[in-house]
Amino acid sequence: MDNTNKNINQNANTNENKKINNKRGSEYKEQLEKLKDKNYIKKLEKQGIKVVSVNDRDYPAKLLPYDHRPEYLFYKGRLPDRDKPVVAMVGARACSNYGRKMARALARELSENGVQIISGMARGIDTYSQIGALEGGTPTFAVLGSGVDVCYPTENIELYNDILKNGGIISEYPPGAGPIAWHFPLRNRIISGLSDKVIVVEAREKSG
């Protein structure tokens, strides 16, 4: 393929990506507009879903310094205790058996010592980190790439429910939002932003 055709294809892809991103942005804004409706808020509360804005007292203080912090956070259960340490544990979905064991053991030990573990409830390292955190007894928190009422991956529904017993499920995406691919890299900034330290248990060299 000559350079002219390459440039045409690159421009076409760029324009298409812009259209997709604009559509996603407008859909997100439409959802957030609903937050001005008190009846909508009451409906969420009946579903056990709470909303906190960047202007609210309960908004996580750790996120405030960041320019790209989410304007709103939706959550079920509760938010991390700001007076206790928070450690994020993340890593590969397709991880080794050794990685799973280490994630679970380390999370359990940290949790036994009063450290709140936060992760993304994804397959692999995230899942085993949160299982270990539950075994340690200190509340753990999951930041999802979907709405807080959408358990993803679906096979983690038991883990999802166990986290809610003492901890919380958090998302910047409105209830009902599906697990769209572009949500996940963005939610990572919330995981790291809420944490005092981040532990990458196992990951490929160019992992997200």
Predicted segments with their positions:
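Short, small/acidic-rich helices and loops at N termini and domain boundaries
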Residues: M1-R57
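Glycine-biased, small-residue-rich flexible motifs in mid-sequence functional cores and linkers
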Residues: N3, E45-G208
